[in-house]
Amino acid sequence: MSYVSGYVPVIPLKNSVLFPDISMPLRIGREKSIAALQKALRDNHWVILLTQKNPNASVDKIEDLYQVGTLAKVESFRMEEDGSYNIFVKAHQRVRLIHSRDSEGHIEAQTEALEDSGRLDKKTEEALLSSLRQLSDDLLDLLPGNTRQIREMIAEIEDLQTLVNMCAAYADINISDKQEILEIPLLKDRALKLLDRLQELKERLKIQRGIRDKLQESFQQNQKESILREQMRVIREELGDHEGEDLFAKFKDKIDKAGMPPEALELAKNQLRRLETSNSASPEYQMIRTHLELMTSLPWNQSSAQQDIDLEAAERVLNEDHYGLEKIKKRILQHLAVMKLRKSQQGSILMFIGPPGVGKTSLGKSIARALGKKYVRVALGGVRDDAEIRGHRRTYIGALPGRIIAGIKKAGENDPVFILDEIDKLTRGFGGDPASAMLEVLDPEQNNTFQDHYLDTPFDLSKVFFIATANSLEGIPLPLLDRMEVIDLSGYTVDEKRQIARSHLWPKQLKEHGLEENQLQITDQALTKLLTHYTREAGVRDLQRKIASICKHMSLKIIKSEGLPLLVEEQDLEDIFGAERFSADMIGSLLPPGVVTGLAWTPVGGDILFIESAQMPGKGNLLLTGQLGEVMQESAKIALTLLKSRLPLLDPLLDFAKKDIHVHVPAGAIPKDGPSAGITMLTSMASMLLNKPVDPKVAMTGEISLRGSVMPVGGIKEKVIAAHRAGVQEILLCKRNEKDLREIPEDIRKDLRFHFVEDVNEVLKITLGVNVPKWDQVQLPPPSPLSSTDAGT
């Protein structure tokens, strides 16, 4: 090989020394090294490999490197996604640094070749060859594993320089010793120095083997763990590495104090043994370490300090944090009373169902405060992979525990109040069904052995007080719903919202905006107008935002007035929010025939809806618009069938065969479904056909059957509150829904007039003032005599 002259790119080596005739894979990741490699690849693939004096320091100048290295050629390379390179180099020549310079973000150097000075006589060379072979065989005897191929390779080498380079490159000796051997000019001296270092290595291996043999003889099978630890201690002392020993001791102490059950304890000890024997640079080492950190940080036996339930304190906390909701608070206190009597909270799984902003999540916080327990919340909206619940298996890169175990770790106690927020928003995806994964979490018979895939050992969730929240029962699988006690939270009345605003929202927003109570106040008239003309919701979330906007708007005025107290009055609301968004009375003074006010339930509370009907010449067809679902379409068909069978008894001139009827429910962009609009659709079509308007202050809800019966529906409280809010004065309900009025506040009930009906004839009489005769009251003509042909004779 001819020597390469001129400037050649320099690549620093951290923990290795490359000898001539030796090939080695290298990973190039530092910026200067990448620049040097790219320069070499553009030219002739030659590089100079120099070892760093301090492997832990960055290379800023040539003085940070040893002055003797090797000239090597890049045989192959591959660029990785992160911009680094994996290369394969072969060293050709020892070289000494003459001159260096910085060039294009890397170091280039001129070198001189280091040739062996002086020749060895044949006897000396053979003696050194024999000594190296014998010492190499002795070292291989002390190493574990199959070394046959290495022995055969050494036996085939006849050149002393090649054998010296090979043994120096692969022997487990210090980097500084390898560098010293590389720099020695004479081959004989290099061989003698190498023999000296290999002899030291042999003695060290013999000591280690002696320690291992002695320990194996002294200890029994049940003390293998101590043997391995002692071996690693000796090895680390020889290498000067104490970090691994400290980490091992730390984990051992944590495992002893964690209070794990037997199965988890056995897994942790196995993982600790694997950690001890793993290379700290390997991915497996980091995976085991992360797993052990999770296992030792979980609260296996750490519970909250307060175990006894103080019902009086719990009631006081609930009343402090929430106004109204008396029935809900009573249900919660009953649940806590059962827990107190059982002296256990196993099986404590509640579900709060209600519109946004009614206090579902904040009730969970209050329960945690009342019980003196940690509070953990996990948002489940949009979760579509069961690994989010059960965790990922550790075989995957970037694996993590599931949200349940992660929440328990965050709490630091094994009995927190755990909020599963928006559980109705779980969706099935390609990664599995998270709702099915929740079955094991929420089943009191199974969750004492809940197994997270990442944790890989059972964890007891039976002490956790789970509280799920949802806006609707729709979308929640029945098996999952069956495992929870459902508590409905309906919307607030205007009076309740007024009290909540005064007692909770207004003081809270004043504090958050740096205001004192004596600096800013709001009149009762302004607060009422804010509730009726600028917000319309079941909860109080939008109300809280509006109060925050008032505080922001008035803060500037307070500063300009030099801190003088201000009062928010009715006229100020228009300056802050603009024109009124809602009318206190949504119902008009008059509706045309065919338009009727109905009541609906939505996941965000009750609401009113108008159903419109029109007729035109046709062939008896029914046209339905407004994005109506199948059940609602069937209700319209039943209503039309009832009218076809009954209205001709009232008006014989009605000819349905020559009319097309069109029924529309406004807000056509919103899908609608359910049977509760049955009587509303029937009344709307009857009003249109008889050309009689219905009082807009009259609203109704109820399902109808083909016999004309009015059947009960759900969501009565939410619907009645919405009707009252909209200005309705009379409501038609099924007779069997009369019992549901007990849930409605007294101040709302006394403002409304209720009609309880059992048949559609009663509905038509109340709304249209018509008295449709029943079939048994109709005088039918006598049947005509049958002809002989009709009689079949």
Curated annotation (Swiss-Prot):
Residues 8-202 form the Lon N-terminal domain. Induction: By heat shock. Pfam families: AAA (PF00004), Lon_C (PF05362), Lon_lid (PF22667), LON_substr_bdg (PF02190). The active site is at S676, K719. Its EC number is 3.4.21.53. PANTHER family: ATP DEPENDENT LON PROTEASE FAMILY MEMBER. ATP-dependent serine protease that mediates the selective degradation of mutant and abnormal proteins as well as certain short-lived regulatory proteins. Required for cellular homeostasis and for survival from DNA damage and developmental changes induced by stress. Degrades polypeptides processively to yield small peptide fragments that are 5 to 10 amino acids long. Binds to DNA in a double-stranded, site-specific manner. This is Lon protease 1. The gene is lon1.
